[in-house]
């Protein structure tokens, strides 16, 4: 049975830069805080663990190499003890967790999102389909079986997208077609519009993401939309600056960009620039009714006889295996990573 009214939270905080263990501990602390506050859902920013590598937008190739090595060393695998600890925290607090993290799989990093349910099971695991611009120097592409967003839950049909995926009209259409009701628009760290320098387009600063793209998503889909954002401190600026380069001294432009919007695009809450913590919202799924009554692009306000979207969720392998009957052995990324295996009922989980 779907709950129609419940409390949720979006994280706006500074990551533990280049620190997997610290990031896991801070994640668990926020899960505990949200659970103690009575939340049924807590949402984290894009690549919250081990932080968004914003330095890649600002440094040369040679300058990036020591930071890239350290970043990769602190990425998180889904079959790791660190990830299982986060799953246990979700189970202990009986809460849904939408987690953004830099996932390492073999030797490639991905901009990953996991949706963990109150039993600690991973009910959705996805990867950003296309890293944005210089992100391609750090991350790989998601595959056909790792990009679906919307998952049926007891909180409603919940979707997740990373950063500029939230303005991708095709992904938005796909989510609408699945009846999305709650959306996690996970964003990284971004400077504000006051830093914009010609000819860099305004698309590339935080304000349009917070105040144009995210409410537009809410309006067009008729969903409750939570936009968790990372923050930055003076110390964080130093950690994200290579040796020999003078770091910035004022982090304020990077802060205060998290938002929560109602299904009609109206603002629920925005933080002050100095706020670090959880933004809370009381969700009522019944508020989706009138927005979708006006414009349901998956139903009465669409013409599939004229416009349709083709979706391919199959995984394309570099190497395929032939079975004894001459067919191709099929398996999913989820199976290979062991995400179909239930979280063990171990002693640590009972603490």
From Swiss-Prot:
InterPro entries, per the entry:
C-N_Hydrolase, C-N_Hydrolase_sf, CN_hydrolase, Nitrilase/CN_hydratase_CS, Nitrilases_CHs
Q: What induces it?
A: By cyanide.
Pfam short name (any one): CN_hydrolase
GO MF entries: cyanide hydratase activity; nitrilase activity
Q: Which CDD domains match?
A: nitrilases_CHs (cd07564)
> Under which main EC class is this enzyme filed?
lyase
Provide the pH dependence: Optimum pH is 6-7. Active fom pH 5 to pH 9.
Q: Where is the active site?
A: 46 (proton acceptor), 128, 163 (nucleophile)
Source organism per entry reads Neurospora crassa (strain ATCC 24698 / 74-OR23-1A / CBS 708.71 / DSM 1257 / FGSC 987)
Listed Gene3D superfamilies: Carbon-nitrogen hydrolase (3.60.110.10)
Give the organism's phylogenetic lineage.
Eukaryota, Fungi, Dikarya, Ascomycota, Pezizomycotina
Stretches assigned to the CN hydrolase domain: 6-285
Entry keyword set:
Hydrolase, Lyase
Quaternary context: Oligomer of dimers, forming left-handed helical fibers with a diameter of 13 nm but with lengths ranging from approximately 1 um at the leading edge of the peak to having approximately the same length and diameter at the trailing edge.
Name of the molecule in the record: Cyanide hydratase
Keyword set includes Zinc? no
GO BP annotations of the record are: cyanide catabolic process
Q: Which family does it belong to?
A: Belongs to the carbon-nitrogen hydrolase superfamily. Nitrilase family.
């Amino acid at each position: 049975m779907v709950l129609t009214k419940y409390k949720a939270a979006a994280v706006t905080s500074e990551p533990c830069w280049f620190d997997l263990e610290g990031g896991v501990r801070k994640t668990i602390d926020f899960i505990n805080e949200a659970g103690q506050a009575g939340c049924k859902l807590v949402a984290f920013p894009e690549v919250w663990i081990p932080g968004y590598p914003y330095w890649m937008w600002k440094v040369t190739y040679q300058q990036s190499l020591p930071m890239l090595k350290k970043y990769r060393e602190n990425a998180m695998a889904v079959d790791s003890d660190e990830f299982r600890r986060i799953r246990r925290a979700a189970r202990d607090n009986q809460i849904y967790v939408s987690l953004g993290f830099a996932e390492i799989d073999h030797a490639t990093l991905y901009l990953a999102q996991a949706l963990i349910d109150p039993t600690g099971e991973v009910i959705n695991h996805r990867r950003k389909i296309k890293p944005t611009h210089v992100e391609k120097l750090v991350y790989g592409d998601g595959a056909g079986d790792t990009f679906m967003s919307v998952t049926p839950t007891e909180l409603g049909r919940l979707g997740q997208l990373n950063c500029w995926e939230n303005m991708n009209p095709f992904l938005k259409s796909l989510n609408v077609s699945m009846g999305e009701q709650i959306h996690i628009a996970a964003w990284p760290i971004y400077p504000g519009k006051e830093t914009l320098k010609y000819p860099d387009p305004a698309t590339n600063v935080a304000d349009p993401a917070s105040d144009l793209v995210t409410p537009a998503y809410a309006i067009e889909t008729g969903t409750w939309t939570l936009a968790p954002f990372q923050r930055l401190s003076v110390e964080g600026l130093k950690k994200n600056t290579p040796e020999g380069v003078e770091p910035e001294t004022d982090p304020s432009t990077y802060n205060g960009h998290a938002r929560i919007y109602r299904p009609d695009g109206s603002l629920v809450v925005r933080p002050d620039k100095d706020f670090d913590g959880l933004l809370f919202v009381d969700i009522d799924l019944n508020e989706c009714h009138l927005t979708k009554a006006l414009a349901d692009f998956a139903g009465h306000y669409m013409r599939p006889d004229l416009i349709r979207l083709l979706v391919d969720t199959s995984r394309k392998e570099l190497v395929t295996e032939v079975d004894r009957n001459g067919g191709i052995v099929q398996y999913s990324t989820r199976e290979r990573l062991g995400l179909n295996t239930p979280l063990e009922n171990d002693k640590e989980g009972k603490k």
